UniProtKB/Swiss-Prot annotation:
It is found in: Cell membrane. This is Uncharacterized metalloprotease BUsg_310. The chain crosses the membrane at residues 23-43. PROSITE patterns: LYSM. Its EC number is 3.4.24.-. CDD domains: M23_peptidase. SUPFAM superfamilies: Duplicated hybrid motif (SSF51261). Keywords: Cell membrane, Hydrolase, Membrane, Metal-binding, Metalloprotease, Protease, Transmembrane, Transmembrane helix, Zinc. The lineage of its organism: Bacteria, Pseudomonadati, Pseudomonadota, Gammaproteobacteria, Enterobacterales.
Amino acid sequence: MQQIYKIIFLSFNQDFFYKTIKILINIILIVIFILLSSCNFLTDKKAFFLNKEFSQKEKEFKRLKEKKEYLKKHTIHKHIFSYGNTISIFLKKSGVKINDILKLIKIDKNLNNITIGQKIVCKVDNLGNLIKLKWYISKFQKKIYKRYKNTFKFIKYTYDSFLEKKSIYIKKNSNFFKSAYQSGLNKSEINSVIKAIEWQINFNKLHIGSKFNVIFLNQKTKNKKILLGVKLDNLDRKYFSIRAFNGKFYDSDGFNKSEELINFSFLKKYRISSPFNLRRVNPVTHRISRHLGIDLAMPQGTPVIATSSGKIIKAQFNKIAGFYISLKNKNYYTTRYMHLKKILVKVGQKIKKGEKIALSGNTGRTTGPHLHYEIWINHRAINPIKAEYILSTQLTKSERIKYLKESKNILSKLK
């Protein structure tokens, strides 16, 4: 019996042992599974945050790249200056920030002196930042301004090509044209020399042995030469004619004594009954309308004098202007004469300044006898009272100082 109990006890202990071992193994497996699951969760969580951080950095990088690309985009604005334009007005219309305009002008105040016919080209980004500006002072001079951080730097003031000097000697049994041709000048170059200095000398009275020194800008890319200066030695007298920034020629002291383009003395003889006004109340219609000229009170039949030389392009009747004349000058401007009694010229006829072209009257839409007079420059009406300054060949005091400074280079090469 005791033996039987022993066997049963051993069997029970063996089953208990195995069950215990099995339970422990299961517990260990469960713990391992939990630990592994926890590691995977942490890894996944870490990966999630890493991916999120990378995604944010990628988005930020993409945003900065797009911003950079956006800033790279720019607009080019070009403009040829006419009466009434300023650098500030042009840059504002081009979308340039006010601060940039002020900084640019502070660097070079001469930008406020841009004259009619000069060209400006500017590059502006999408945020209104001025990137670059070119000022074409003349056919042979330009200034370049470039953005540098938050300000601007003056880059260059240059001749585009190279200078070419030639000498012309007046020989016996010859004249200027023949001598210049023998010196290698073509017809166009010879004519440019004549126009540059004819207001100082008489080409028919040049003496044998007289010598011309001329300097041209040789534009390689355009296969063209531009006259910059002329010097003449004639009977121990020296004459100079240097091209200025406005394209006109002046002597070594900055003066040009050539004849004025428009004879304003005729206009000054009569009272202005109605001035130039872009918002005038019309005395006939009683509506606000542009008055693009001046009215000169004068009796009917008063001789109307051509204030400039040129060609008649219109001589006809209009129900508002009455009998009127348009006279075009080769130097880019036109003068108009309205409400005439009688026209004394024909279309196509060439007229000299001071020549009688009509009789004043009271035709068209008027309230009384007068002459309506207009001046147009580059297809734009200007105030005739201010035109005397605009069309003047003379330099202002500040322009003359600028000319004397800039002409030194050409003068030194002519001597």
